[in-house]
C-alpha cells in the first residue's frame, strides 16, 4: 500500500469529518510585540489585522470565538545586549514566557489558537505553549527566511531571526543560555518541521538545514514542483505516518512584496496570492490545524494607507482560509436545504403578511 494512497485516504476522511462539523472553537490572541528586531511598528500588527475584519470573517465561517484581546507584556527596564550583539534578550524571553502561558491555557481549553504578531520571535512562546498540551505537534513554517540562526551565528542580533534554534532539540548544544530564556525547553525535532517559501537564507542557516536534515521548499522548489506537489510532500513528511496537531507559523513576508508591502524584511520573488491561499486551504483540509501564528505585519512601514490595508487584508485571508474559507466562497455548512411550504400553508402565510 503506497504512502500516497494512505495519505489520500487520510485526507479524504478528515475532509469528510470537517464537512460534518460546522463550528471551530478559535481563540484569538493579540501579541503587540516588536523587540525581537529593531524596527518600530510591528507592535501595531494585531490592531491592523483586527481592523481589517478578522473577527467578523471568522464569525461568518461559523467559528465560535474567544478573544483574549491584546496582551500587555511586562516591560524590562534595563535590557543590555547579550554578547554585545543580541538585542533585548530579557524582553523577548519574558514576553514569550507570558505568551506561552496564554497559548497553553487556550489549547488546554479546547481552542485552536490564533496569535497575531508582532514579530516572529513570538513563535518561541506560541510553539512552546502549544507543545505543553500537544507534545507530538508538527510545524509548517511559511516564510521568506529560515529564522534558525543561533545567537552565535546571527549577524544582526535580532531574535526574530532565531526562534527555531531555541525550539529544536538537535541544536541545543549549539545555543548558549540567554538571560530570560532559562524557562525554554526544546520541544520539536528536525523531522517535525517543514519550511515553505524560503528565498533569503543565511550561510549558517543553510548549513543547519542541510546538516540537520530539515526539510524545506524554497521558492525555486515551488516554481519547479508547483504548490500542490509541495503540500503533498509536506503532508507526507509530517502526517503521512500518523495524525498529529499542526502548528502553522506564517510570516506575511512569505508573500511577494507587491502583495504584502507593509512588513519589515520584504524579499522579492515570494508567494503569489493563490499559492498562499492554497497552503492555508490544504492545511485546513487536513482537519489537524491546532495553532496558527500570523506575524510581521507592520503598518508603520507602509508608504500609504492603501499598502497598510492591503497587507492586513492579506493576513485576514490567510487566517480565514486556514479555518474554512474557500475561493468558491466561505460558507457555514448546511445539513439540508429548506423546502417549499405546502400551497395551503403558503396561502395562509401570505394572508398573514397582508
Curated annotation (Swiss-Prot):
Pfam families: Arginase (PF00491). Residues 334-354 are annotated as: Disordered. Keywords: Adaptive immunity, Arginine metabolism, Hydrolase, Immunity, Innate immunity, Manganese, Metal-binding, Mitochondrion, Transit peptide, Urea cycle. It catalyses: L-arginine + H2O = urea + L-ornithine. Pathway: Nitrogen metabolism; urea cycle; L-ornithine and urea from L-arginine: step 1/1. Binds 2 manganese ions per subunit. One of its GO terms (cellular component) is cytoplasm. Mn(2+) 1 binds at residues 120, 143, 147, 251. Its cofactor is Mn(2+). InterPro entries: Arginase (IPR014033), Ureohydrolase (IPR006035), Ureohydrolase_dom_sf (IPR023696), Ureohydrolase_Mn_BS (IPR020855). Its EC number is 3.5.3.1. It is found in: Mitochondrion. Mn(2+) 2 binds at residues 143, 145, 251, 253. GO terms for biological process: adaptive immune response; arginine catabolic process to ornithine; innate immune response; negative regulation of activated CD8-positive, alpha-beta T cell apoptotic process; negative regulation of CD4-positive, alpha-beta T cell proliferation; negative regulation of chemokine (C-C motif) ligand 4 production; negative regulation of chemokine (C-C motif) ligand 5 production; negative regulation of defense response to bacterium. Its main location: mitochondrion. It is an enzyme of class 3 (hydrolase). GO terms for molecular function: arginase activity; manganese ion binding. Substrate binds at residues 145-149, 156-158, 202, 265, 296. Residues 1-22 form a transit peptide. May play a role in the regulation of extra-urea cycle arginine metabolism and also in down-regulation of nitric oxide synthesis. Extrahepatic arginase functions to regulate L-arginine bioavailability to nitric oxid synthase (NOS). Arginine metabolism is a critical regulator of innate and adaptive immune responses. Seems to be involved in negative regulation of the survival capacity of activated CD4(+) and CD8(+) T cells. May suppress inflammation-related signaling in asthmatic airway epithelium. PANTHER family: ARGINASE, ARGINASE-2, MITOCHONDRIAL. Homotrimer. Belongs to the arginase family. This is Arginase-2, mitochondrial. The gene is ARG2.
Amino acid at each position: 500500500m503506497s504512502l500516497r494512497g494512505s495519505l489520500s485516504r487520510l485526507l479524504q476522511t478528515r475532509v469528510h469529518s470537517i464537512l460534518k462539523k460546522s463550528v471551530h472553537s478559535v481563540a484569538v490572541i493579540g501579541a503587540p510585540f516588536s523587540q525581537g528586531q529593531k524596527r518600530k511598528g510591528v507592535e501595531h500588527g494585531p490592531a491592523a489585522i483586527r481592523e481589517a475584519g478578522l473577527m467578523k470573517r471568522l464569525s461568518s465561517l461559523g467559528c465560535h470565538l474567544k478573544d483574549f484581546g491584546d496582551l500587555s507584556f511586562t516591560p524590562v527596564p534595563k535590557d543590555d545586549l547579550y554578547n554585545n550583539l543580541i538585542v533585548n534578550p530579557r524582553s523577548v524571553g519574558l514576553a514569550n514566557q507570558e505568551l506561552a502561558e496564554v497559548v497553553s491555557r487556550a489549547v488546554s481549553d479546547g481552542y485552536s489558537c490564533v496569535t497575531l504578531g508582532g514579530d516572529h520571535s513570538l513563535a518561541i512562546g506560541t510553539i512552546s505553549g502549544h507543545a505543553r498540551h500537544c507534545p507530538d505537534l508538527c510545524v509548517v513554517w511559511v516564510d521568506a527566511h529560515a529564522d534558525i540562526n543561533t545567537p552565535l551565528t546571527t549577524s544582526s542580533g535580532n531574535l526574530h531571526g532565531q526562534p527555531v534554534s531555541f525550539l529544536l532539540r538537535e541544536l541545543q548544544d549549539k545555543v548558549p543560555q540567554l538571560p530570560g530564556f532559562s524557562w525554554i525547553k526544546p520541544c520539536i525535532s528536525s523531522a517535525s518541521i517543514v519550511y515553505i517559501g524560503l528565498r533569503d537564507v543565511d550561510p549558517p542557516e543553510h548549513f543547519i538545514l542541510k546538516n540537520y536534515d530539515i526539510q524545506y521548499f524554497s521558492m525555486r522548489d515551488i516554481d519547479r514542483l508547483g504548490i500542490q506537489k509541495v503540500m503533498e510532500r509536506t503532508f507526507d513528511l509530517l502526517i503521512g505516518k500518523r495524525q498529529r496537531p499542526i502548528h502553522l507559523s506564517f510570516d506575511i513576508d512569505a508573500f511577494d512584496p507587491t502583495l504584502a508591502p507593509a512588513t519589515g524584511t520584504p524579499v522579492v520573488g515570494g508567494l503569489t496570492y493563490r499559492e498562499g491561499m492554497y497552503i492555508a486551504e490544504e492545511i485546513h483540509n487536513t482537519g489537524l490545524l491546532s495553532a496558527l501564528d500570523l506575524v510581521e505585519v507592520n503598518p508603520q512601514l507602509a508608504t500609504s494607507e492603501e499598502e497598510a490595508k492591503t497587507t492586513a487584508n492579506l493576513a485576514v485571508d490567510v487566517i480565514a482560509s486556514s479555518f474554512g474559507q474557500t475561493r468558491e466562497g466561505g460558507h457555514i455548512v448546511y445539513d439540508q436545504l429548506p423546502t417549499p411550504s405546502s400551497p395551503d400553508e403558503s396561502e395562509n402565510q401570505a394572508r398573514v403578511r397582508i
